[in-house]
C-alpha cells in the first residue's frame, strides 16, 4: 500500500467514525472518482448507518437521469463547479442525507465526449446543513488512474472533515 493510499484510507476511517458518532448521514454522486469516495466510506465497520446510498454518474446522460439539470451542463460544461454543485444537491435530495458530495472532472487524459475536458482538472462540491462548498483543483500527474482517484478522494476528505 502506498503512502498516499494509507493516508487517504485513514482520513476516511476518521470521517466514517465521526459521522457515526454524530449520527450524520452522507451520500455521493461521483463521476471521475468512479465511486471511490463511497467505497472508502464503507471500508469502516458501521458505515451502513451513515452512507444512505451513492450514484456513479460517469456520463452526462447518467447525471441528467439523476436530476442534474441538463441546462447547467450545457451552460457551464460538465466539468464545472456548477455541475459538481448540482450533483451534490441532487444526491442530497435523493437520499435526504445530511452531507452530499458531487465530483466531476478529467483525470489523466482528454475526454473525447466533452469539449471542455482538461486533463487534471477536477471540480467537486459538498452540500450540507449549513450550506455548500465548491472547489476546483488541479491534480498533479500521477502514475495510474487509481492514484488520481485517491488524490482527489483525499482532497474531498479534507473538505468533508471541515463540514461535519
Mark where each language-model region is:
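Short alpha-helical segments enriched in small residues
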Residues: 1-164
Amino acid at each position: 500500500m502506498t503512502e498516499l493510499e494509507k493516508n487517504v484510507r485513514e482520513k476516511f476511517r476518521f470521517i466514517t467514525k465521526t459521522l457515526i458518532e454524530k449520527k450524520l448521514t452522507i451520500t455521493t454522486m461521483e463521476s471521475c472518482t468512479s465511486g471511490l469516495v463511497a467505497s472508502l466510506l464503507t471500508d469502516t465497520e458501521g458505515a451502513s448507518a451513515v452512507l444512505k446510498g451513492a450514484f456513479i454518474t460517469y456520463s452526462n446522460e447518467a447525471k441528467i437521469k439523476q436530476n442534474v439539470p441538463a441546462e447547467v451542463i450545457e451552460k457551464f460544461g460538465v466539468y464545472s463547479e456548477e455541475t459538481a454543485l448540482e450533483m451534490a444537491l441532487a444526491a442530497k435530495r435523493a437520499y435526504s442525507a445530511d452531507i452530499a458530495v458531487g465530483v466531476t472532472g478529467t483525470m489523466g487524459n482528454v475526454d473525447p465526449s466533452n469539449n471542455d475536458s482538461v486533463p487534471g482538472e477536477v471540480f467537486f462540491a459538498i452540500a450540507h446543513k449549513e450550506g455548500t462548498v465548491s472547489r476546483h483543483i488541479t491534480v498533479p500527474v500521477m502514475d495510474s488512474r487509481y492514484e488520481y482517484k485517491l488524490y482527489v478522494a483525499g482532497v474531498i476528505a479534507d473538505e468533508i472533515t471541515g463540514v461535519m
